[in-house]
């Protein structure tokens, strides 16, 4: 297949996929957004609005949308996957035989592969082969604010520096700063764990435990990120940057976060089912909490906050019981001596 100058295919027409497709189109790149919902795709393509996920926010006239995956990726210079983590593997497998020769694949999906707990770059590499450039787009970014043109900073980590740079340059603009790195493991870990930790801070705020508790949970949550990162060979500086600390702070404090809103609802006494129904979109933490703890057990790392979130989400503990379990833990040094060595 031929490759059109810099056509970009974005797979996934949810809020984040639509926001990134809109950003790329506004930056002058021929951009096609693929989605499964025919009515929503038609609204994006013809009326330039995503009425379900980003109602009332105009999208660029140049942004095209389709339900035909082959048409979406044909001639693309590179492809950006922005689906929920549970649909990531399925989407990449459908993409594999259609991908134009030489087209790299990036994703802005956050989470692990359900069931196996594998990192998404491991899934992509297995499906796409060894020669396809890969990159992950992550960092503190709410879709609504990006489509409104509010200042945002993200980071792109890839296994081929030139491809990560290509993705970053396409996204970089007056109100959108895109940095680059080469630590895909750390970038993916931060993007997944922050969703689980946002539930914890949401629960605390829902229970009206105060700002001290919120700050403590965010900081000790970062500690959990750093310890698991060290165990799996990620770079600590990745977790101290946009992919870790930045995304953690945003998701734990901003009410646009679905995971924080889930925690708020649980802290106020709602059931998980009612809270998820009320939010009306995929809440990644419900699944990711299991996969985070699978990684922790695999590497022998104690993650008390993440584990309490998992227990609450599974109905094994109430939020009050989870809080008591955390507060009953023994006194210890703030950081292990070996963490930054």
From Swiss-Prot:
Spans through the membrane: none
Gene3D superfamilies for the chain: N-(1-d-carboxylethyl)-l-norvaline Dehydrogenase, domain 2, NAD(P)-binding Rossmann-like Domain
Annotated metabolic or biological route of this protein: Membrane lipid metabolism; glycerophospholipid metabolism
Keyword Metal-binding on entry: no
Catalytic activity: sn-glycerol 3-phosphate + NAD(+) = dihydroxyacetone phosphate + NADH + H(+); sn-glycerol 3-phosphate + NADP(+) = dihydroxyacetone phosphate + NADPH + H(+)
Pfam family for this entry, one: NAD_Gly3P_dh_N
Places the protein is found: Cytoplasm
Enzyme Commission number: 1.1.1.94
Alphabetical keyword list: Cytoplasm, Lipid biosynthesis, Lipid metabolism, NAD, NADP, Nucleotide-binding, Oxidoreductase, Phospholipid biosynthesis, Phospholipid metabolism
Positions contributing to sn-glycerol 3-phosphate binding: 110, 139, 141, 194, 247, 257-259
InterPro entries for this protein: 6-PGluconate_DH-like_C_sf (IPR008927), 6PGD_dom2 (IPR013328), G3P_DH_NAD-dep (IPR006168), G3P_DH_NAD-dep_C (IPR006109), G3P_DH_NAD-dep_N (IPR011128), NAD(P)-bd_dom_sf (IPR036291)
Keyword flag Iron: no
Chain positions recorded as NADPH binding sites: 15-16, 36, 110, 143, 258, 282, 284
GO annotation, biological process: carbohydrate metabolic process; glycerol-3-phosphate biosynthetic process; glycerol-3-phosphate catabolic process; glycerophospholipid biosynthetic process
Family of this protein: Belongs to the NAD-dependent glycerol-3-phosphate dehydrogenase family.
Protein function: Catalyzes the reduction of the glycolytic intermediate dihydroxyacetone phosphate (DHAP) to sn-glycerol 3-phosphate (G3P), the key precursor for phospholipid synthesis.
Name assigned to this protein: Glycerol-3-phosphate dehydrogenase [NAD(P)+]
Organism the protein comes from: Stenotrophomonas maltophilia (strain R551-3)
Gene field: gpsA
């Amino acid at each position: 297949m031929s490759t059109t100058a810099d056509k970009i295919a974005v797979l996934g027409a949810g809020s984040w996929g639509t926001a990134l497709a809109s950003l790329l189109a506004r930056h002058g790149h021929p951009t096609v957004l693929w989605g499964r919902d025919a009515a929503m795709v038609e609204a994006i393509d013809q009326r330039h609005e995503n009425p379900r996920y980003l109602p009332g926010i105009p999208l660029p006239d140049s942004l095209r949308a389709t339900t035909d995956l082959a048409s979406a990726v044909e001639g693309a210079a590179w492809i950006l996957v922005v689906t929920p983590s549970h649909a990531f593997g399925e989407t990449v497998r459908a993409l594999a035989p259609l991908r134009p020769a030489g087209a790299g694949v990036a994703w802005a999906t956050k989470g692990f592969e359900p069931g196996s707990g594998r990192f998404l770059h491991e899934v992509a590499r297995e499906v796409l082969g060894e020669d396809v450039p890969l990159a992950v787009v992550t960092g503190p970014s709410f879709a609504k604010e990006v489509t409104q043109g509010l200042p945002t900073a993200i980071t792109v980590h890839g296994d081929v520096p030139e491809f990560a740079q290509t993705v970053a340059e396409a996204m970089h603009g007056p109100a959108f700063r895109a940095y680059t790195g080469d630590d895909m493991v750390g970038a993916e870990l931060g993007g997944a764990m922050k969703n689980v930790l946002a539930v914890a801070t949401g629960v605390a705020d829902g229970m009206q435990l105060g700002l001290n508790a919120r700050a403590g949970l965010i900081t000790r949550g970062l500690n959990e990120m750093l310890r698991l990162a060290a165990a799996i060979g990620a770079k600590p500086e990745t977790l101290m940057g946009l992919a870790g600390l930045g995304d953690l702070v945003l998701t734990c404090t901003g009410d646009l976060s679905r995971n924080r809103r889930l925690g708020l609802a649980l802290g106020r006494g709602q059931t998980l089912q009612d809270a998820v129904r009320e939010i009306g979109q995929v809440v990644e933490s419900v699944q990711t909490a299991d996969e985070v703890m699978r990684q922790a057990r695999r590497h022998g790392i104690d993650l008390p906050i993440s584990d309490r979130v998992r227990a609450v989400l599974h109905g094994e503990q109430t939020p009050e019981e989870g809080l008591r379990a955390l507060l009953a833990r023994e006194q210890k040094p703030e950081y292990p001596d070996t963490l930054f060595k």
